[in-house]
Amino acid sequence: LHKEYRRQRQMCIRDRYVPKPYYFTDNMAIYQLGEHTPDIAASAYVTDTATVVGRVTIKDNSSVWFQVAIRGDNEDITIGRNCNLQEGAVLHADPGYPLTLADNVSVGHQAMIHGCSIGEGSLVGIQAIILNGAKIGKNCLVGAGALITEGKEFPDNSLILGAPARAIRTLNEADVANLQRIANSYVERAREFKDKLKRIG
């Protein structure tokens, strides 16, 4: 696995894409870093294979799914209410660039979220990348594989696609309602997993 990860890392440098997370392992945990301890709401759901480190706040009814990594070593990372961070997502921040997710934000599988702010009700698609200082408005949809470069800003209700990403159109009421439906479904799914998930091997 280490050899494969090194190979993909070299490809990442050459082709500017993010390697698949071969470095994730089981038995991840919640860590204090120095004086900083994650603040996780009692109603939040964090799987036992997720990693949460340091200056991280996770608010009510949010869910952190399998093999998610949230590393709050340089700046505060704030996850609002009713958010969901799906499998393999990575959240980090550089000095001077705190990371903030407003309420009802969905982060898709293997997305990379770095030192940015994402407005209420927005969804970040699978393997999308959002870099330092970027600002995503409310009720935006960031498409799968999109690359949002440093400092880029998008208004509310934007459909954001491409690498580098650009706003394609304005989302309509039905689009926005679907984003909310997805966020709501993860709140319910997390409650179900809390009650019914049982490890058998």
Question: Where are each of the predicted segments found?
Answer:
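Left-handed beta-helix
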Residues: 42, 47-48, 53-54, 59-60, ...
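Single conserved hydrophobic/aromatic residue that forms the stacking wall/gate
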Residues: 1-15
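Active-site cofactor/substrate anionic-group-binding motifs, chiefly glycine-
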Residues: 77
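Intrinsic-disorder-associated, low-complexity terminal segments enriched in Asp/Asn/His/Tyr and depleted
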Residues: 22-27
